[in-house]
Amino acid sequence: MTQTNLMTAPSLQPGQLIARGVTRQLAALGFASVEELVPTRGLRVDVMALGPKGEIWIVECKSSRADFMSDSKWDGYLEWADRFFWAVDADFDIDLLPEDTGLFVGDSYGAELLRMGPEKRLAAARRKKMTHLFATHAARRLHLLRDPHAIPQWG
């Protein structure tokens, strides 16, 4: 039997490093978070966070101007969360980002919430769907962590 060293992480891309810092800050704010969640066909959010009062936040991590400019789907995420945020590093020109969205600035070790995203509460049915999706996504990630050789038959 071989044992996987959970402390050794694979090489992370710049956006994933920002996501790591953001998830640390979200945890400090009392949120649980998952990365790369698909709320609906054609969309994949970088970070979804579930707050202590059931609030749902989506955070999109951008590592460069080119990364931001190539993202034409971000406004499609707004209908899947109570609040929407960008997360960028300290060198990113934040003037490029829409002012009516939230903002984290960080790195792989942490992040700071600079601007709270405006709240648009989800309808009860959408909230139930997203909470279930969050729980399922988290459980499957945990399953694969414990059994990385499993070939899941999840649809």
Regions from the language model: what does each represent?
Residues P14, P39-G42, M69:
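Short secondary-structure boundary/capping elements
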Residues E36-V38, E60-D67:
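Short, flexible loop segments at the rims of nucleotide/cofactor-binding pockets, characterized by
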Residues M1-M7, G54-K62:
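N-terminal short leaders/motifs
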Residues T2-S11, Q16-E35, L96-G155:
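Non-catalytic C-terminal interaction segments of nucleic acid-processing enzymes
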Residues E35-P39, D91-F92:
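Short, solvent-exposed loop/turn elements at beta->coil junctions and helix N-caps
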